[in-house]
Amino acid sequence: VDLWGMNVYRWDNPENIFKQWSALSDKPMYLSEAGSDSYMTVANHEFSKGENEKAQAHSLNNILDDVFEYRSINSGVLVFSFTDELWKAGNPNIQDVGGWAPASSGVPYDGTANEEYWGILGVDRDKKEAFYVLKGFYNKKN
């Protein structure tokens, strides 16, 4: 194995995975999946219940801060996911709340992975606030 990829969901703070990895191995690693959804099942951490792009953008900003801060350990990140996915829960023709992994402790900020709301683009390919966060990181880091 030349490179390890890990799907890591540690709220909006993956920092300790990089520290843990560096203590375990000198092989390179990257986050093969990280992100958050744009639906708040409950109001929490000053984010309102319902569709909430601000919560998703805020958590992605925090995740990317850590990713770029630990570049000596971490080779990068694949943000999950590019677009919202209608087929993940309930009716495949409408965007539903819910899906797999309710009460997932690693999902910001409500602990619930609303599977159809993880995209940085909406179902109609409209750019969410998280898209601009990601774009901004790569524009300022290059």
Feature annotation, model-predicted:
Residues F80-N142:
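Aromatic-rich peripheral "rim/lid" segments of glycoside hydrolase catalytic domains that contact
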Residues V1-E69:
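Extracellular glycoside hydrolase catalytic/binding regions
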Residues Q20, I73, Y109-T112:
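Residue-level signal for the start and early helices of compact helical domains
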Residues K27-S38, S75, F80-N93:
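Short, solvent-exposed beta-strand-terminating loops
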Residues A57-R71, F80-E85, I94-V97:
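C-terminal structured "cap/appendage" subdomains that terminate the fold
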